[in-house]
């Protein structure tokens, strides 16, 4: 018989990319586990929807309605998001936006606030710059605005809605903004007491507040902001270092007992420069999802890059707007499931 053949060596496994940052929250034992993110459940439309853009609309118009393919799947999905955003709310609500510098945190805050304002015309929506490192929220919404926390809190004659908005800026979507400390002029540092008084006044008139937070979790102002939030958006770059910072933010919330806020949070992977690697993005997104946090990827959009006023209606790319609609609808779902706190907060005065 022929001699036995030597065994074939096993192939060398391919080299795996570096593992993404690990998020391992350790909430107190008595706290409930984070609930699953809410699924928007829009009410059915009374009439069939017509395509409002693209080749489907062109075909319908060219044939005088004889050929009507209806809205595309993407348009139907957008309509679901919009109906979720427009769901009935009681009282007033706050969502914070956190992230380290350079990840597009302010762009996310301005975009989400603008969509809330555009789609909830019956309410008043305000964006608040609580970033003490010369935040730029005002320049993304209304660069002409000169109002500040100190003016808003010092004036004792601000009784009506019109009195208050005279101290605020506003964009075309209807989003009002309270800017932070200007880069020029005497330096004044926003403290928790001034922030608390300003938001108390704004709560009298605004249903939804979007707060652009500072990047230092242990800062007294950031902790004051977190204390009063109903939902949180954690913004990350689609790179390992940005995701590590986002993971540390979520761990900080768990370690400090903010498990309810953690359950009402989501991660936005924001491609702010257009150089993100698709495979890395997928790995990072899966890491957060595996640890119970919903992740929404926002693609690169040249409109958001220069640093000017954000226009969610005319200038923002449709794919980007669709992702921000999903972010905003998810936050609206968190708002809708909050227990009634009408005794804690005054209803908005219109």
Predicted segment positions?
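Walker A/P-loop phosphate-binding motif and the immediately C-terminal alpha-helix
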Residues: 77-79, 91-131, 138-139, 202
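NTP-binding/hydrolysis catalytic cores, primarily Walker-type P-loop NTPases
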Residues: 306-350
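Beta-strand-loop-alpha "switch" segments that mediate conformational coupling across diverse proteins
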Residues: 271-317
């Amino acid at each position: 018989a022929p001699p036995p053949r030597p065994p074939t060596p096993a192939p060398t496994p391919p080299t795996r990319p570096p593992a993404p940052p690990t998020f391992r929250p350790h909430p107190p034992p008595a706290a409930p586990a984070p609930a699953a993110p809410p699924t928007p459940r829009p009410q059915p439309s009374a009439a069939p929807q017509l395509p409002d853009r693209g080749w489907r609309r062109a075909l319908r118009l060219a044939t005088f309605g004889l050929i009507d393919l209806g809205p595309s799947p993407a348009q139907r999905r957008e309509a679901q998001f919009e109906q979720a955003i427009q769901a009935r709310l009681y009282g007033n609500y706050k969502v914070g936006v956190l992230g380290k510098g350079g990840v597009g945190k302010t762009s996310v805050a301005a975009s989400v606030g603008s969509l809330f304002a555009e789609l909830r015309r019956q309410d008043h929506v305000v964006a608040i710059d609580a970033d003490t490192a010369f935040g730029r929220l005002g320049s993304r919404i209304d660069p002409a605005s000169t109002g500040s926390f100190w003016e808003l809190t010092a004036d004792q004659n601000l009784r009506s809605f019109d009195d208050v908005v005279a101290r605020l800026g506003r964009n075309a979507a209807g989003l009002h903004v309270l800017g932070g400390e200007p880069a020029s002029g005497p330096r004044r540092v926003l403290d928790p007491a001034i922030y608390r008084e300003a938001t108390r006044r704004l709560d009298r008139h605004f249903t939804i507040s979007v707060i652009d937070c500072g990047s230092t979790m242990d800062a007294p102002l950031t902790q004051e902001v977190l204390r009063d939030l109903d939902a949180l958006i954690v913004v990350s770059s689609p790179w390992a270092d940005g995701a590590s910072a986002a993971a540390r933010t979520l761990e900080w919330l768990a370690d400090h007992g903010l498990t309810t806020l953690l359950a009402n949070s989501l991660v936005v992977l924001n491609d702010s420069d257009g150089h993100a690697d698709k495979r890395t993005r997928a790995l990072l997104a899966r890491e957060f999802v595996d640890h119970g946090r919903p992740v929404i990827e926002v693609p690169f959009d040249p409109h958001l890059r220069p640093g000017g006023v954000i226009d969610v209606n005319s200038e923002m790319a449709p794919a980007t707007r669709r992702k921000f609609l999903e972010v905003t609808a998810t936050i609206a779902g968190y708002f809708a499931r909050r227990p009634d706190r009408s005794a804690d907060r005054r209803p908005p005065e219109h």
